[in-house]
Amino acid sequence: MQKIMHISVLLSPVLWGLIFGVSSNSIQIGGLFPRGADQEYSAFRVGMVQFSTSEFRLTPHIDNLEVANSFAVTNAFCSQFSRGVYAIFGFYDKKSVNTITSFCGTLHVSFITPSFPTDGTHPFVIQMRPDLKGALLSLIEYYQWDKFAYLYDSDRGLSTLQAVLDSAAEKKWQVTAINVGNINNDKKDEMYRSLFQDLELKKERRVILDCERDKVNDIVDQVITIGKHVKGYHYIIANLGFTDGDLLKIQFGGANVSGFQIVDYDDSLVSKFIERWSTLEEKEYPGAHTTTIKYTSALTYDAVQVMTEAFRNLRKQRIEISRRGNAGDCLANPAVPWGQGVEIERALKQVQVEGLSGNIKFDQNGKRINYTINIMELKTNGPRKIGYWSEVDKMVVTLTELPSGNDTSGLENKTVVVTTILESPYVMMKKNHEMLEGNERYEGYCVDLAAEIAKHCGFKYKLTIVGDGKYGARDADTKIWNGMVGELVYGKADIAIAPLTITLVREEVIDFSKPFMSLGISIMIKKPQKSKPGVFSFLDPLAYEIWMCIVFAYIGVSVVLFLVSRFSPYEWHTEEFEDGRETQSSESTNEFGIFNSLWFSLGAFMQQGCDISPRSLSGRIVGGVWWFFTLIIISSYTANLAAFLTVERMVSPIESAEDLSKQTEIAYGTLDSGSTKEFFRRSKIAVFDKMWTYMRSAEPSVFVRTTAEGVARVRKSKGKYAYLLESTMNEYIEQRKPCDTMKVGGNLDSKGYGIATPKGSSLRNAVNLAVLKLNEQGLLDKLKNKWWYDKGECGSGGGDSKEKTSALSLSNVAGVFYILVGGLGLAMLVALIEFCYKSRAEAKRMKVAKNAQNINPSSSQNSQNFATYKEGYNVYGIESVKI
């Protein structure tokens, strides 16, 4: 059993004499306050002081308890009754209402309460809170809702819900009723989010919140978290304290929010009370010292006034009221009711006064009648009264605005505010913009597009640059949209014409037209330095595999030619002199030895030829196919040689997103607020998820505030930073001086830029049709060519593309010179070796001949002559070419 904290406030006779006068008449008043109702208790105390009288004094006995605990309520009520109270003020909920009403009816003790009104007849219960059913049904009909969700707190009873369901059955409304009163506090945030996500799947964007302030605030927090507080959503807060909640956090979301207000702050009586209320000390009166008051606190203050007025009327009627001898046990069996309790009930029901909650009057059942409830709507400048509801007049609208909040006035009569962003080449300041005014200060793709859209739709427009320079993203903590999206969501602009990417999260809060430009995320890097050709770059036209095959083919052809020449009888012939006479020797010769075969193949490959040619058919077949082979190879080589020698190629260290993700030397990042960052954050693809993990944890941060900052970082990083941005912007910057950036790889995704309007805007259809028409006319492509390529500064091939051809430098052909010098050197070396070899051989021969002469002197002369002739023949004759 939970222990009840019992607080009895008994003011001393001296103090009460100072407050209420010198009269000793004391009227005991009970009070049952729930824990945490500090402001209500402060209002109760202020009322005790405010409505004091010299005729009698009210003496309160206060109990703070859990009103949901029926046992605690029973003990407190019986304790109050045994003290001899004349009436009890207090609160109840659905668990304790039957206990309290039963005691009141049995013991004839009047109970004045600001809690929710009950159905049926409950004697001795005076209900300070007006019934909201009639006003709520009238507001639903005013908004012409026929399909909505109804979220209710079962702790407040089900009477209002039952009335709505009865009307729904009669008028064929589609109502989704959901009880949020039993949601576990530990998981409430998650459950609220899940609830509204389920409603979104059902396209339920009209919601009634039949809850008290604290629960409404909890629900609104989660509505903001999941982005359901924007245009296109409408909420009705079904309690009497529209201004009691924290409306500031949802005020600029764009959603329509309506409700009811029982305390009219424009009323003079309320204004005077607030002046005094705001001067009270917070420590002495918790919840005071503010310029507002909760409607339950206002009803508490009014209840004190009603009790005071009732007892004053009894005094005027000279009806003596006393509890002497009547303070008994409330649990006695049989129960003994208080005999004079009926007189007090009658006096309370007959009270008619003006209070903080307006006109206070009761019917025979103790329920409020002849009251007025203000109808409120939340505007961007705060809560605003749009009308009121009363039992006689029903709903009366005093503010002539359409309930939907959409502007349907003619476009031709309105200057449309167009928000955009300074981003080349979409929107740029003209060089002489300081001398111009209005839209004339700007130029660019989107400036021309805005003019065309306005011409097709027939409206005047004003270009404004977004204040924070952002495209639009929702803050993870505050859930507030920034950038151009925020200006649309919060009603600061009518349309956004800019390079704004169409994404799911943005589509949830704003409307997009058909894409006016298709694009994707691409990689920008600093253009690498052109690679200089190598010493042997003349070998590049053919792959190394081909060169190896040519070498083997050369050797193979030479060997085959040698073998064919040896086996073919037609390749052998006798030697002839220059005058045509044959030698007297019968020996046949063959010119295609192995070295001559190699020389013949080399000469044919170099297209130079040699002095010998095959005589046999087989040898000529070998030579023919070799000539054909060399013809094709040399022609192909020559065709590619010019391109390889004159074009300086750029070697990029990065070719794709995979290359970026696999290395850490080159940093990479995106715009800090935009769709590109969202793409990586939400992507489930392994490569992109790996890139996002790196980007969000990189130090220093790889994110940049603007595209210009990202481009500057690429240019200054010396190839150590890559910037991820839309391909269209990448292509544009590549065409701008100093022409030192380039796009690498393909696009990472496919998306489009669209023109954005607020949810439900009347501009949406007109703008959409205009975009389609411009696309069919080819004007969109014409605008892109104008601002991307016609005004480009680097040409199609970069900054040096103006030169048609590049002159060959020494480095292009250095290898050829090296081979020439090497060949000459090799020839001289071989010649030296041959000379040395021949000299040594000649020395040996001369030595042998001299020795022979010494042995046979008689024949030395003839032998010498013959040797001299033979040597001359070997050196200069035909044999000099024989192997």
From Swiss-Prot:
Membrane topology qualifier:
Multi-pass membrane protein
Q: Which GO terms describe its biological process?
A: chemical synaptic transmission; ionotropic glutamate receptor signaling pathway; modulation of chemical synaptic transmission; signal transduction; synaptic transmission, glutamatergic
Quote the InterPro entries the UniProt record gives.
ANF_lig-bd_rcpt, Glu/Gly-bd, Iono_Glu_rcpt_met, Ionotropic_Glu_rcpt, Iontro_rcpt_C, Peripla_BP_I
User: Which residues carry the post-translational modification Phosphoserine, per the record?
Assistant: S683, S717, S860, S863, S880
Q: GO MF annotations for this entry?
A: AMPA glutamate receptor activity; amyloid-beta binding; glutamate-gated receptor activity; ligand-gated monoatomic cation channel activity; transmitter-gated monoatomic ion channel activity involved in regulation of postsynaptic membrane potential
A GO cellular-component term linked to this record = plasma membrane
Instruction: Explain what the record says happens when changing Q607R.
Output: In RNA edited version
What do we know about how this protein assembles, alone or with others?
Homotetramer or heterotetramer of pore-forming glutamate receptor subunits. Tetramers may be formed by the dimerization of dimers. May interact with MPP4. Forms a ternary complex with GRIP1 and CSPG4. Interacts with ATAD1 in an ATP-dependent manner. ATAD1-catalyzed ATP hydrolysis disrupts binding to ATAD1 and to GRIP1 and leads to AMPAR complex disassembly. Interacts with GRIP1 and GRIP2. Interacts with NSF via its C-terminus. Isoform 1, but not isoform 3, interacts with PICK1. Interacts with CACNG2. Interacts with GRIA1 and SYNDIG1.
The extra comment attached to this record reads:
The postsynaptic actions of L-glutamate are mediated by a variety of receptors that are named according to their selective agonists. This receptor binds AMPA (quisqualate) > L-glutamate > kainate.
Q: What is this protein called?
A: Glutamate receptor 2
In its UniProt entry, the species of origin is given as Homo sapiens
